[in-house]
């Protein structure tokens, strides 16, 4: 259910009933030719990093900017360096994916999600393939991004992340979505 909701918000899955909006965009009324424009407003982070193996970090990020219409190479370079600074890996700009740890790859994926100054960031199990230390590093970066004003909607099954990085919690249960208080969720987890 968690990943399906994120896919619906990203317009990878069609919304059949109910209502969903990103900003002023009604996802149920969205036309096929409007999807690329919507996706420029959304940053997405998957648990599998999906980096291009034959390109270094700079070229991986530049590929996204070129694909979304950024034609000025000077502006692309500035945006890439700015996003890499935000996730604390500017020093890895010339490294290839096979030279990066899992946590570093995920930070590249987060930088990629920030490139187009998204209105919202969708993070689908962003620490799912990481060791505990890398998970904490990635979550700290996401917290910094959130505290700087970006909205992040994260799907996770990792209860320990909810304990360490508290925020608003939305629970998917039996096809229903509801907001839940952390303490109530903790009690339900204990007695489940």
Where are these regions (language model features)?
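Helix-to-loop junction immediately C-terminal to a conserved catalytic motif
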Residues: 10
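Conserved ABC ATPase "signature" region
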Residues: 25-26, 62, 66-69, 73-92
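Conserved ABC ATPase signature
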Residues: 96-100, 104-106
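A short, proline-enriched helix->beta-strand linker immediately N-terminal to the Walker B motif
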Residues: 115-119
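Helix N-cap at the start of a conserved alpha-helix in ABC-type nucleotide-binding domains
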Residues: 132-134
